[in-house]
Amino acid sequence: MNKKKVLVLAVSVCLVAILAIGGTLAYFTDTDSATNTFTAGGVKIQLIEQQRNDARTALEPFEQNKNLMPIVGSAQGEQQVVDGVKLPKAQNYVDKIMTIKNTGVSDAYVRIFVAVPTALQNGQTPNAPRYDVLHWNFNGDSCATGEWTDEIVVANPTVINGVEYKIYSRTYTTALAANEVTATPAYIGFYLDKTVDQNADGDWTVDWGNGPEVINYDLSDGVEIPVFAQAVQAAGFDSAEAAFTASGLPENPWA
């Protein structure tokens, strides 16, 4: 497909949150998706999702059903700061800025999970982010001491609504006080690889340098990115890891 046709590619991406309730055992815990909340005891959280407004001058609540198109520019290139969050200036970058607020009365540790379709990662090439069809990222500020842990894979594969996903997680290492929001986002957005195209047979392809490879996923059907957050009481624990280990909350909320 020529460059002109690439410009009209548009895939609906529904960056949704799907609810899955975890066990609570004897500890106060809470879970939250973008639209659903389960509360147990004195811990309560809100998963906040935001995007830049049309003028790119302020953050506003995230809206579903974005058009996902190949990125123009680089997500690691020129950045801008909007409401304290560093974000890529690249065109066709889809903001999904995820923070968590402690809306309860007790200090709490929090963590977040993101599910990405397995078929949109790594293709037939070595396991490295540069070979993803669908990319996602967080800025370096979130890796500072006391902020978010490095991203880990907690499950692969997991089937959600008939689609195979790989589940990623990050944990906020500092306990959140009542009404406090994580100082940095866990994730800031998603983007389609700049080489994504459609061939003459209608197959979606990606090219990482060795010619187009067919993607084993029909992007015409859209992409769902489930997101899930968990919280556990901080009282009695010296670290987020210890608190979540004792809580009994599932490490894969969609299992």
Question: Language-model segments: which ranges?
Answer:
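N-terminal Sec-pathway targeting helices
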Residues: M1-V11
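Surface-exposed, hydrophilic segments of mature proteins
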Residues: V8, Y27-A255
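Hydrophobic membrane-insertion alpha-helices, especially the h-region
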Residues: A10-I21
